[in-house]
Amino acid sequence: MTRLTRFAVAPLHSMTRRLADVASARVAPDLVVTGARVLSTYSERIHANREVWITGGRVAAVKPAGTARKAWSGVALYDAAGAIIAPGLVDPHIHIESSMVTACAYAEAALLNGTTTIFCDSHEIGNVMDVAGVEAMLEDARQAPLSIFLTVPSTVPATSAELETAGGDLTPDKIAGLFDRWPEAVALGEKMDFVPVTMGDERSHAILAAALKRGRPVSGHVYGREFVAAYAASGVTDTHEAIDRDIADDLLDAGVWVFLRGGPPTTPWHSLPQAIRTITELGASHKRTAVCTDDRDADDLLLFGLDWVVREAVKAGMSPEQAWSMGSLHGATRFGMEGDIGGLGGGRRADLVLMDDQLKPQCTWYGGELVVEHGKITPRLDQALSQRYQYPKAAYATVKLPEKVKLTPELPAKACTVNAIKTALPGITLIHEKVAIEPAKDWPTLFARYGLCFVTVVERHGKSAGNVAYGLLKDFGLKRGAVASSVGHDSHNIIVAGTNEPDMQVAIAAIKEHQGAVCVVADGKVRALVPLPIAGLLSDKRVTEVAEEVKVLKKEWAEAGCTIPYMGFNLIPLSVIPEIRITDKGLVLVPQMELAPLFE
């Protein structure tokens, strides 16, 4: 039996005669899905009483229901019983690593939610393992039962060696090499350093040139309307960071595709309701907008897939037909693949979703193979998910720590000012707050007086003399113990917050033991832990298993008192988002792109 991957369906050029024969009823199709209401993403209409003819994993034609029975006896039929049939969803911007599972494991959740194609920016593993990590992810993707394409990481590291230590450094030449070696490398990933881009930074523009010379589009990441014109002029033609109506409107008029990012509601990333107002209030066309998920942990990936984002677009004022087109055809069109995916026209891949009137997927066909039926994976998909890619040994040895690390600063002996990191919901922007403190007898007294706790970043790539940076979080809410993660964006050094050194040491030891993890510690015991042995970012388990671990983590995280979710905590070292961050080099004042002392 052919392995269930993207490559199981032959290229269109090799199938045109066969498809024409089937569409003309000279040859029987392999499968007919009949009795359906077909959602056309081309005309944005739903056609009643239709059937889809499939051969060789591609759509031959959409016909009136009952046509196949008249032409042939014995053809395989699947009765849709009046349900809606639509093309599989296409997610134009995601990071697989955020789900904490491999590409193969990710496929299970995607297909359960009707997503059959994704465009992945693997800059997380690139920040840890350089080109070797990106290529390992590509090999994983090739063997997954899902169509996965790469937008080559463009900003590794996120800033500079002066401000942080990363495990990878993707130079313009390395990026060009990835484009040249991998046909799946279809675009340049999000160019997060938008300020250097708009200021004409030489390295940033050399990276842009590596893509543009090869005819690859460039994905973006920008905040602030004042940057839009120069950013678009630099060749960036999509972004998922349109966080409100007005910047979304500016971007569309500048010729930039807008990917409306949907939630989930438990995180700070639900910008769709605001950005979509450029369409619903200002009258902009939806033809150059798509919907995306961006980041999902394993738990949220199962609960809030791209189908959920489509339904959110409907709640915000789009018609179901428009919203599904934004979730399928538009993403395909942005990357020039509308001739293969995103619709049910003749010759397209037979990636189909059967759903109810609320646009909730019930069944999924991937390349003409039924992989999800009535909300459950089929034996065919279960077999494919068991044939997972084995990551190289080096991926299981990326947490390199000194034998002993002091995790807390000395208590100030006299009055001073703290450059504190103030956390607040939604948790993306961190506020630089100068806190004047008076001497205290010990840290607990000082913490209680000013609403502070420790935060420390430890370099884990073995590229420094054991860099450790100390900071203080304000209003983080941690009542006891410690929380820690090896997923400290984007360089993925270890970040640990705590109320005391012993519990912080237990947390660091747990991460070292598992070669990566996110954990909660209290009273010297690990209360919750998600092991991440692959690059300190990914589990080697099925997505459903990891989702259960994440549920326990979230429960313990909340009980510890943390005011922002753990995915927001992971962003505390991300030195490209205002106002203040902490990396292994120290406190970073983002607007100035310079380091600051903890105490003044």
From Swiss-Prot:
GO biological process, one term: adenine catabolic process
Enzyme Commission numbers on file: 3.5.4.2
Acetylation keyword on record: no
Catalyzed chemical reaction(s): adenine + H2O + H(+) = hypoxanthine + NH4(+)
Lineage top rank: taxon: Bacteria
InterPro entries: Adenine_deam, Adenine_deam_C, Amidohydro-rel, Metal-dep_hydrolase_composite, Metal_Hydrolase
Enzyme class, broadest EC rank: hydrolase
Keywords (A to Z) from UniProt: Hydrolase, Manganese
Family to which the UniProt record says this protein belongs: Belongs to the metallo-dependent hydrolases superfamily. Adenine deaminase family.
Name of the featured protein: Adenine deaminase 1
Originating organism: Bradyrhizobium diazoefficiens (strain JCM 10833 / BCRC 13528 / IAM 13628 / NBRC 14792 / USDA 110)
Gene that this polypeptide is encoded by: ade1
